[in-house]
Amino acid sequence: MNIQTDVLIIGTGVAGLYSALSLKNDIKVTMLTKSKACECNTYLAQGGISTALNKKDEPLFVDDTLRAGQYRNIKESVKILAAESKQNIDTLINFGMKFDKNEDGSLNYTREGAHSVNRIVHSTDETGKVVFETLYNEVKKRPNIEIIENIQVFDLISEDNICFGASALKNNTIYTFHSKATILASGGIGGLFKNSTNQRTLTADGIAMALRHNIDVRDLNYIQFHPTALYDSNTQEKKFLISESVRGEGGKLLSIENERFVDELLPRDVVANAIYKEEEKDNSKYVYLDITSMDADFITKRFPGIYKECLSRGLDITKNKIPVTPVQHYFMGGIKVDFNSLTSMKNLYACGEVSSTGVHGANRLASNSLLEGLVFSKRAAENINHSISFIERNEKNENLTLSDALSIIKCNRNIVINKFESILGEKKNELVNI
């Protein structure tokens, strides 16, 4: 089945939804998602969104991001992130986003690891869910935007290093989407790992297609492990994250001997490594995160999602310490893009976790992921707004069979598993089996 559209967006997380909303209303947009629209990492994000408080805070925000990233970031990208943060937060608010506020009506800012000041806006401990719902509801109002769920994109349509759309599979039917511009916003790699906070459907499909088409990628070894996922030996599903904002509000990390062993607000990689060492020293599979000294009413109001989830597993976090351990959480590497999110293939953009803007360096600063998705997806959309009238659609017929599609899907899977096995080396057993 052949479908013509102006802009094809692969993914329905913050980067996909926000790019769609940032395109002009006379542009026909088709969005594809592998499962349900809400089954994205954005929906799971807890802590919040970083933002420069004002012009004066921008240099400090840049410095914090560079320091957390071990100075392997692209500084100009970080400057863009800081400079354009507030305007995108304001746009979210105009769409109806409800951030937590102080009694005087001002935004309530919290602090997380490696931030010098409180600069993170949030919606209790379910910021990502509220961001998703805000953007998704706005998208549903736009007659120029169509979302197709439960469809697996398995290949890009290209010729002479120019992208003309993508091929996808739904209910054993092959769909060929011809577009003037294509945005890859397909998310990260957590579904490749046995233990991850990510949705299980996020299996590096965008990275696989980029590798198969010789599209430039960067820093594929930059994989972040979040220090504090709930330790639960009874489930093989995605691991439940205990937000960094819990430590930002005063939560303490303790060994199983109830001793503090690390500054809780150091960068994530530092805290995760400290926990690994403590677990090895004590021959334990977890350490404790303790918030029992906090007021119970504050805990249930500030962290309602975490409280309810832990309680459903028999753990009252107002009275008991939380067993936590590091698990795979975020992918800082990805498809190499310029400052407008353009890849090395013409008319193909990449935004969000699948992309490498250079913002994060070797270790992402807490709560910069949703912000990156906002800032650089808007830049992609604005670039398309200015260029789309000069682009002609190429309706190249792929003539793929179901057998071809299934073979390519298997090939994509093998490519990324083999790639990340070579990257992880001795830790390759953390990946799922092919």
Curated annotation (Swiss-Prot):
Indicate which residues the UniProt annotation says bind FAD.
12-15, 34, 41-48, 205, 353, 369-370
Coiled-coil intervals: none
The family line of this record is:
Belongs to the FAD-dependent oxidoreductase 2 family. NadB subfamily.
**What this chain does, per the record?**
Catalyzes the oxidation of L-aspartate to iminoaspartate, the first step in the de novo biosynthesis of NAD(+).
Major place of residence? cytoplasm
Q: Name one GO molecular function term.
A: L-aspartate oxidase activity
Using the record, list the residue span of the signal peptide; answer none if the entry has no such feature: none
Q: What's the protein called, per UniProt? A: L-aspartate oxidase
Organism for this UniProt entry: Clostridium acetobutylicum (strain ATCC 824 / DSM 792 / JCM 1419 / IAM 19013 / LMG 5710 / NBRC 13948 / NRRL B-527 / VKM B-1787 / 2291 / W)
NCBIfam families per the record?
PRK06175.1
Q: Which cysteines are joined by disulfide bonds?
A: none
The chemistry this enzyme catalyses reads: L-aspartate + O2 = iminosuccinate + H2O2
Q: In which pathway does it act?
A: Cofactor biosynthesis; NAD(+) biosynthesis; iminoaspartate from L-aspartate (oxidase route): step 1/1
Q: Where is this site: Important in orienting the L-aspartate substrate?
A: E112
